[in-house]
Amino acid sequence: VRIGNGRIGAMVFGGIEEETIALNESSMWSGQYDENQEIPFGKERMNELRKFFFEGKIQEGNQIAGEFLHGNGHSFGTHLPIGDLKLTFSYPENTVSNYRRSLDLGTAISTTNYTIGDVNYVRECFATNPDDVLVLRMSASKKKAINAKLSLSMLRESEISTDGNQLIFEGTVNFPKQGPGGVSFQ
């Protein structure tokens, strides 16, 4: 299930023993500015092109368009995902039942529900626009029933550290196939 607020996005896979949340953020771009991409076409050329097409001179119009309406072969980069947040859960040996995933279109909350033995588990994930954060809320019908290990698998060159209760990752969005460069992030 995909969720997001226009800047932060995630794909919630909804597993029971392992939950994967693929993370995304709008500024994660590889590449760099390339002034050679800006080939001026000009108002005169556009008028000439329109004239050819309106007169039915398609071949001549295509010649002008093919010659002037494209960038050069340099790549300016691409948008790339951040990485995967993984939660690995430990449960007492028992039967899983009542598994259900949903996305409430009114609240934009992705929910995963299931029961193991006599314990009901609920995971809710959403991205708020006013607070500009991604939230994962986990609950269980019995106290101390949630036992999970957290890991972050970064798809970019990065370092991960902690500061109090914050997980910090910083690095560079580099994708050699798309050329040099990329934004730095924290």
Give short role names for the model-derived ranges.
Residues V1-Q186:
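Aromatic-residue-lined binding/catalytic grooves and analogous aromatic/hydrophobic interfacial grooves
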